[in-house]
Amino acid sequence: MKHLVITGDRNTGTDHDFTGAFEPESVRYAKHWRSKGDAVDVTRVDLSKHDRERVAQMLTAIRTAAPIDRLAIFSHGWQTGIQLGLSSSSSSARDELAAFATALACASTPELRIALYCCSTGGSDVPNGLGSFADRMRLALVAAGRRDVTIFAHRVAGHTTRNAAVRLFGPGMTGGVDLGTTREARQRLDAQLHAGSDPLRWTLPYLPIDEARAAYP
């Protein structure tokens, strides 16, 4: 498998979000998958640039790494976008998201899976995340030819990799499905994601959705 990891390149203001979370977690992700024999490219986006330039940097990295099977993004996020320049908050932003999806589809394999290690990208005003950034990103990729793509996202704000508010978006779905909806499953999911020796935070985004739901109902 070929992975591409994308992060920002600096802390935001006085926060230690990059050096304290996004950078070390992206390094751990790459180390894990390389230990399994996978190829992993890592790129950093210059956050001093405007949104369109950030997206252009991501596209350059995607084309350089092609063909990719796995895309992992470590950054801030919200219900309608991510820190690295992509948004779904307006018609023009959705057009840009569609253009990004087309380029990603051309530079990826049919096995493409995406992990959004970003806050809130799977959340919306609808309980199943319909209309969220992750949902719109998946639909844009489907329109671009990646009909089987799945996207891992978080419903609410939390740690970039240890947030147990997980929502998965996949083929044939309207919106997404939540993991850990029972108390026992949520506690187990939370414990595993917080355990430094447990690889679940790297493997969960790429499990078949039915398998993930069966393990963490």
Model-derived features with residue positions:
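Active-site-proximal C-terminal subdomain of hydrolase catalytic domains
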Residues: 113-217
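Extreme N-terminal starter segment of soluble prokaryotic enzymes
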Residues: 1-4
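Catalytic-core segments of thiol-dependent peptidases
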Residues: 7-126, 209-216
